[in-house]
């Protein structure tokens, strides 16, 4: 974001960064700070100013954000943060990434070696650790939370550490658990934790003496006028327009900027930034009522090929790898790059990363949302399907890492068979990390996708197995009524197929549930039914499961 501290002052951010984040004090102690604001008031901009100022010289700064689809992706912001810390690149093979993680971790402190397997697993690198493989999901979850926390705290003993999380309103439950753990340990480390979020986000940090919740209010009239002087200039003829803009936008900085940009694009204003003049009279000027309407109008005025490019980028997400955009844009490379240059000049997108692969991002989350919403449903569906196909083609060796994104695009692209496959893989991956709520969301979405496939025997078998998957994640959450409902549905489907093996597993799972809730006699009835089925089928695995729970029921 190309803006100076002087420009930040012009934005009316009346609380100076030094007052918000006293970096000198964090050298001795830790603080956490959070912004709770509506979009467009300048949270991200103020953070950018702070982390790029002299106040953080000599600090290690780690940044991460949450995506709107990230709630179904356990640890997504944490993974981004770790990739930045270990200087992971998209092209890194597992061997190379293992070397980076192992080398940096052990050079930091050999006492962190027990955390190595958890960190490698988070980064989708096989740990090759038999002890890790023997752990059950809750134990892995605890090791993961402890490992990331210990890494950050140990690093903070070497140098002041700033950890920044953006858009916590989109955070997943496992990242939330890590933040809660980290906040508890802040008093013992030189660590500044910054977070921003919208008002609907809830947390339990408010009572901490070292936590500050901050709010950037909309600009007061005098600050809004100062911002408009910086944007428009000081032509006396602009004063009625300035007042109209201040009244219409209610002091929202992003709304003000976008409104000015709209007036420039529609030739109401002529000249250059900081030296505009009116080309028409104020009574004839119409300013849209909301920032979303301003953005929608700006997008509609783009040349058709640039509008299509922006919309395609929005379907990819807020972060847009150039290679992926090229794969779906259906434009020659020269045309695509020219279009991106124009979109940057219009301040709709900007380059977020140059190395090792060029990546773009939207100027603001609202820009991304409005661009995505401007697409017709059929075109949106087509682009999602193309993106899923492009990810498979571009990253064939990294599909495990990309599985949540693949599931997201395949489902919204209505590529139902792939959606079922990737959603089930994503759910299994989440369950392995003890991210049970995210696993449930994936498995339930897979069931929705499955309903769109032809009703074959294989499809019904998958429907049963997905309900078994749901059982494994719902039980740790204590959601027993939903669990029973899915098991009864599985039983009904298995009976229609006369699938005795799956009926046996339904009986085992019902027996386990009844036994765990203190109904041993009823549980034994189900387990004995499973034993009989196992004996008839000579199914060793089913027999072992039935005998195991039968032994518990008669104890």
Annotated model-derived regions:
Residues 36-41, 46-52, 80-81, 181-182, ...:
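Short secondary-structure boundary elements
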Residues 41-72, 76-80, 88, 444:
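P-loop NTPase Walker A phosphate-binding motif
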Residues 394-399, 449-463, 492-501, 534-540:
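Flexible helix-coil transition and linker loops at the boundaries of alpha-helical arrays
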Residues 1-35:
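Short hydrophobic alpha-helices and adjacent helix-cap/hinge residues
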Residues 153-195:
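Conserved Walker B catalytic segment
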Residues 370, 408, 425-432, 465-479, ...:
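Tandem amphipathic alpha-helical repeat scaffolds
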Residues 49, 55, 74-162, 190, ...:
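Conserved Walker-type P-loop NTP-binding/catalytic site
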Residues 360, 381, 385, 400-407, ...:
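Start-of-helix signal in alpha-solenoid helical-repeat scaffolds, especially tetratricopeptide repeats
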């Amino acid at each position: 974001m190309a803006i100076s501290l002087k420009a930040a002052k012009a934005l009316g951010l009346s609380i100076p960064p030094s007052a918000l984040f006293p970096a000198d004090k964090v050298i001795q102690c830790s603080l956490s700070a959070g912004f709770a604001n509506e979009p467009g008031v300048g949270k991200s901009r103020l953070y950018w100013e702070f982390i790029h100022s002299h106040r953080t010289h000599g600090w290690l700064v780690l940044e991460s954000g949450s995506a709107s689809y990230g709630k179904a992706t356990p640890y997504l912001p944490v993974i981004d943060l770790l990739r930045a810390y270990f200087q992971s690149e998209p092209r890194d093979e597992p061997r190379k990434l293992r070397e980076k993680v192992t080398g940096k971790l052990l050079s930091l402190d050999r006492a962190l070696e027990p955390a190595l397997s958890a960190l490698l697993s988070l980064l989708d690198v096989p740990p090759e650790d038999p002890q890790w493989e023997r752990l059950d999901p809750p134990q892995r979850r605890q090791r993961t939370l402890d490992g990331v926390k210990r890494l950050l705290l140990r690093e903070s003993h070497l140098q002041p550490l700033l950890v920044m999380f953006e858009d916590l309103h989109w955070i997943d439950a496992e990242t939330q658990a890590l933040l809660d753990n980290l906040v508890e340990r802040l008093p013992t480390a030189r660590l500044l934790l910054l977070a921003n979020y919208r008002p609907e986000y809830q947390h339990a940090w408010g009572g901490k003496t070292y936590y500050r919740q901050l709010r950037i209010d909309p600009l007061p009239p005098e600050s809004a006028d100062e911002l408009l002087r910086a944007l428009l200039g000081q032509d006396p003829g602009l004063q009625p327009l300035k007042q109209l803009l201040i009244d219409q936008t209610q002091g929202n900085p992003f709304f003000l900027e976008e409104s000015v940009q709209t007036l420039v694009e529609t030739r109401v204003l002529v000249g250059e930034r900081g030296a505009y003049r009116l080309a028409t009279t104020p009574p004839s000027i119409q300013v849209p009522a909301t920032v979303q309407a301003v953005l929608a109008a700006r997008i509609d005025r783009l040349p058709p090929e640039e509008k299509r490019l922006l919309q395609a980028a929005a379907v990819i997400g807020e972060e847009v790898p150039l290679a992926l955009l090229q794969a779906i844009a259906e434009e020659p490379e020269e045309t695509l790059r020219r279009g991106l240059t124009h979109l940057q000049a219009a301040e709709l997108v900007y380059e977020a990363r140059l190395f090792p692969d060029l990546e773009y991002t939207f100027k603001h989350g609202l820009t991304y949302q409005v661009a995505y919403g401007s697409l017709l449903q059929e075109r949106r569906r087509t682009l999602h399907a193309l993106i899923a196909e492009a990810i498979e083609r571009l990253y064939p060796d990294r599909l495990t890492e990309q599985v949540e994104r693949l599931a997201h695009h395949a489902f919204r692209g209505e590529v139902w068979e792939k959606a079922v496959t990737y959603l089930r893989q994503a759910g299994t991956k989440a369950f392995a990390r003890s991210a049970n709520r995210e696993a449930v969301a994936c498995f339930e979405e897979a069931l929705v996708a499955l309903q769109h496939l032809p009703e074959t025997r294989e499809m019904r078998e998958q429907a049963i197995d997905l309900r078994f998957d749901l059982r494994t994640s719902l039980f740790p959450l204590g959601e027993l009524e939903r669990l029973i409902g899915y098991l009864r549905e599985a039983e009904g489907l298995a009976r229609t197929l006369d699938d005795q093996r799956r009926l046996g597993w339904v009986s085992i799972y019902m027996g386990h549930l009844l036994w765990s809730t203190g109904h041993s006699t009823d549980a034994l009835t189900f387990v004995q039914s499973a034993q009989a089925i196992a004996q008839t089928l000579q199914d060793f695995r089913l027999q072992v499961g039935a005998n195991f729970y039968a032994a518990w029921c008669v104890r």
